[in-house]
Amino acid sequence: MGKITFYEDRSFQGRHYECSTDHSNLQPYFSRCNSVRVDSGCWMLYEQPNFAGCQYFLRRGDYPDYQQWMGFSDSVRSCHLIPHSTSHRIRIYEREDYRGQMVEITDDCSHLQDRFHFSDFHSFHVMEGYWVLYEMPNYRGRQYLLRPGEYRRYHDWGAMNARVGSLRRIMDFY
């Protein structure tokens, strides 16, 4: 079971809302979110209702302002508690629809292009575990949650292009 608390003001001040499950619409509970405390679990926050818009991965810890979770604004409108998984396996492909070169990964990779020499990554097949995909190397830039399943093209994981710089397993205990 996870637990996350959203605060309207920075440094855990102002009106707050405690949550322990997925929420598709947080708007009734607070108008803005400037700080977050994650007591347990791993969470994906979304700027828009219904798990849409920019995504932000948070694990246990304190985030006194939205820049701490690489947020672009104080807008958090939905959240998803990420299930715990013990094993991780993902296949990445050079082209859409699982074409081109394929590489299977079971660990984090801070710089995909250096490691595999592809210029773009157009499709993914998540066999086991949950992953966070980052737009830039060293776990920076826009973030995307990858759940077990198939992602035939970058639109399937919510991206505007096939630029992928790094990939990290979600491995936090409750």
Swiss-Prot record:
State the Gene Ontology BP annotations.
Answer: eye development
Q: Where is this region: Connecting peptide?
A: 84-87
Q: Name one Pfam family in it.
A: Crystall
* InterPro entries tied to this protein: Beta/Gamma-Crystallin (IPR050252), Beta/gamma_crystallin (IPR001064), G_crystallin-like (IPR011024)
Beta/gamma crystallin 'Greek key' domain: from which residue to which, for each copy? 2-40, 41-83, 88-128, 129-171
Coiled-coil ranges (or none): none
A GO MF annotation of the entry reads: structural constituent of eye lens
**Highest taxon listed in the record's lineage:** Eukaryota
Q: Which keywords annotate this record?
A: Eye lens protein, Repeat
Q: What does this protein do?
A: Crystallins are the dominant structural components of the vertebrate eye lens.
Task: Tell me its family.
Answer: Belongs to the beta/gamma-crystallin family.
What's in the domain note? Has a two-domain beta-structure, folded into four very similar Greek key motifs.
Further remark: There are six different gamma crystallins identified in mouse lens.
The protein's name is Gamma-crystallin F
The organism named in the record is Mus musculus (Mouse)
